Amino acid sequence: MKRTYQPSKLVRKRRHGFRARLATVGGRKVLAARRARGRKRLSA
């Protein structure tokens, strides 16, 4: 069986990137929550 994590910078950016987060209401909530917590990095 192959490993489930096959790293790809492009897919990572598209799925978990800042622009992807801003594109949906849920993603915006994620960013707001991470800002409220004082996270150094908001997204991938």
UniProtKB/Swiss-Prot annotation:
The keyword Ribosomal protein applies. One of its GO terms (molecular function) is structural constituent of ribosome. Keywords: Ribonucleoprotein, Ribosomal protein. PROSITE patterns: RIBOSOMAL_L34. It holds the Pfam family Ribosomal_L34. One of its GO terms (biological process) is translation. One of its GO terms (cellular component) is ribosome. HAMAP family: Ribosomal_bL34. Belongs to the bacterial ribosomal protein bL34 family. This is Large ribosomal subunit protein bL34. The lineage of its organism: Bacteria, Pseudomonadati, Pseudomonadota, Alphaproteobacteria, Hyphomicrobiales.
